[in-house]
């Protein structure tokens, strides 16, 4: 089978690697990702928003279906355009992708269809009304731009914001900058608990969940600093998490199933990957937000333990015949290596040296993200996350240890969170959840 891969990050590298076990991958990427280039039967480097070029590349290589990695092309309607040319995609249409690309749409969907896991919130297109909501709410809030911001637009009182007065200042900034493409904002209650992710394959009707994972979005050790796209993640061999019970997992999946039914009624059938970001609270799972594609880094966790044919699954998704998917009973840990002082880095265009042979000898893998391969084949940093180092073992503890050893073979002006998935941090999360449940 010939499959078109759209995207140029570590998520796409992980997807392509899984597809490549049984299919030929043809990659359309915005910059030359060395891992993707190596895997691909053919590739081109071009603007990921140029749909005419994407379609031309797909047709020249006679691909049978497409797998869309990032959210931006989904928001712009790449799936709709490919469908017009007879190329089916693993990825939702523009209207169905609103579950991620429009936070106001997502919250209203929960309200209209009485989906469990909803929270107190308000959507505002008037600045004074937003201020009034915050003043009357009288509790710490979370402020979100309505549209896409690359995972970096959410700010929380008690974290990035000192108090609700600062929240109002941030609301003003969102309005004036039209952050996320909207002159509007979603304001939500601040939830207390532990965040986690469940991703699922969806064929329009059937939803098959993957192992749960937990991301670490804060830039610095100890869950400090600004929110990033994710500094690392882990999954456990029982497909749960140390603080997440089977009942919690099942309730989360039920919420996702009700969501895809609601999307089908409101817009059209949802096909592709659905990523649910949840908060486990005292009274059960609550939905923080959805993504219309694999998470980054969580894609690396689940795709590294999939014990099935991703190309076959992709075909079943577009055909509406999704059946079952098998996963190994293994634990995984992924840690992101990023430029020094990320996300406010000044070391872009410097060389990062990656000894993949040594990393592979240790039993770890590398997934390249926002790096580019220069004319002399050197790998250079950009201002974003550089690469994910992932290990799969029988326990989180073993996988974390391998990850740390492997990262020693990445040299350059780089940094990583060495506390991701450590026993100490996991125990903190277990203790925190026990306190929340009291």
Swiss-Prot record:
Binds 2 magnesium or manganese ions per subunit. SMART domains: GARS_A, GARS_C. GO terms for molecular function: ATP binding; metal ion binding; phosphoribosylamine-glycine ligase activity. Mn(2+) 1 binds at residues 277, 289. Mg(2+) 1 binds at residues 277, 289. Keywords: ATP-binding, Ligase, Magnesium, Manganese, Metal-binding, Nucleotide-binding, Purine biosynthesis. Its cofactor is Mg(2+); Mn(2+). Mg(2+) 2 binds at residues 289, 291. ATP binds at residues 134-197. Signal peptide: none annotated. It is an enzyme of class 6 (ligase). Its EC number is 6.3.4.13. It holds the Pfam family GARS_A. One of its GO terms (biological process) is purine nucleobase biosynthetic process. InterPro entries: ATP-grasp (IPR011761), ATP_grasp_subdomain_1 (IPR013815), PreATP-grasp_dom_sf (IPR016185), PRibGlycinamid_synth_ATP-grasp (IPR020561), PRibGlycinamide_synth (IPR000115), PRibGlycinamide_synth_C-dom (IPR020560), PRibGlycinamide_synth_C_sf (IPR037123), PRibGlycinamide_synth_CS (IPR020559). The keyword Magnesium applies. It comes from the Archaea. Mn(2+) 2 binds at residues 289, 291. The keyword RNA-binding does not apply. Pathway: Purine metabolism; IMP biosynthesis via de novo pathway; N(1)-(5-phospho-D-ribosyl)glycinamide from 5-phospho-alpha-D-ribose 1-diphosphate: step 2/2. Belongs to the GARS family. This is Phosphoribosylamine--glycine ligase. It comes from Methanosphaera stadtmanae (strain ATCC 43021 / DSM 3091 / JCM 11832 / MCB-3). The gene is purD.
């Amino acid at each position: 089978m010939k499959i078109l891969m759209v995207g140029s990050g570590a998520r796409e590298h992980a997807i392509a690697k899984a597809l490549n076990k049984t299919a030929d991958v043809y990659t359309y990427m915005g910059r030359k990702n060395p891992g993707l280039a190596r895997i691909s039967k053919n590739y081109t480097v071009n603007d990921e928003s140029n749909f005419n070029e994407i379609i031309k590349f797909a047709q020249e290589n006679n691909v049978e279906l497409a797998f869309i990695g990032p959210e931006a092309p989904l928001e712009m309607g790449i799936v709709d355009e490919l469908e017009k040319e007879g190329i089916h995609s693993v990825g939702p249409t523009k209207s169905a992708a609103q579950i991620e690309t429009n936070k106001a749409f997502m919250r209203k969907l929960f309200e209209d269809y009485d989906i469990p896991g909803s929270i107190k919130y308000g959507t505002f297109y008037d600045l004074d009304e937003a201020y009034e909501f915050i003043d009357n709410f009288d509790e710490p809030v979370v402020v979100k731009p309505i549209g896409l911001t690359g995972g970096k637009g959410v700010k929380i009182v008690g974290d990035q914001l000192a108090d609700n007065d600062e929240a109002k200042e941030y609301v003003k900034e969102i309005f004036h900058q039209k952050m996320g493409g909207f002159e509007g904002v979603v304001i939500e209650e601040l939830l207390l608990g532990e965040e986690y992710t469940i991703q699922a394959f969806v064929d329009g009707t059937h939803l098959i969940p993957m192992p749960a994972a937990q991301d670490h979005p804060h830039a610095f050790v100890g869950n400090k600093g600004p929110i990033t796209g994710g500094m690392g993640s882990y999954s456990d061999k029982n497909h749960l998490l140390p603080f997440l019970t089977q009942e919690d997992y099942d309730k989360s999946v039920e919420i996702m199933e009700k969501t895809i039914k609601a999307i089908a009624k409101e817009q059209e059938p949802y096909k592709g990957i659905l990523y649910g970001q949840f908060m486990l609270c005292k009274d059960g799972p609550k939905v923080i937000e959805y993504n219309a594609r694999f998470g980054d880094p969580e894609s690396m966790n689940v795709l590294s333990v999939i014990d099935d044919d991703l190309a076959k699954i992709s075909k079943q998704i577009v055909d509406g015949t999704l059946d079952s998917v098998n996963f190994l009973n293994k634990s995984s840990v992924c840690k992101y290596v990023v430029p020094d002082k990320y996300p406010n880095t000044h070391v872009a265009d410097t060389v990062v040296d990656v000894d993949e042979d040594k990393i592979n000898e240790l039993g770890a893998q590398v997934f390249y993200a926002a790096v580019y391969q220069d004319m002399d084949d050197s790998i250079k940093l950009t201002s974003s996350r550089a690469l994910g180092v992932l290990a799969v073992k029988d326990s989180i503890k073993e996988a974390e240890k391998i990850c740390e050893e492997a990262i020693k073979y990445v040299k350059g002006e780089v940094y990583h969170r060495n506390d991701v998935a450590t026993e100490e941090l996991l125990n903190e999360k277990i203790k925190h959840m026990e306190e929340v449940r009291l």
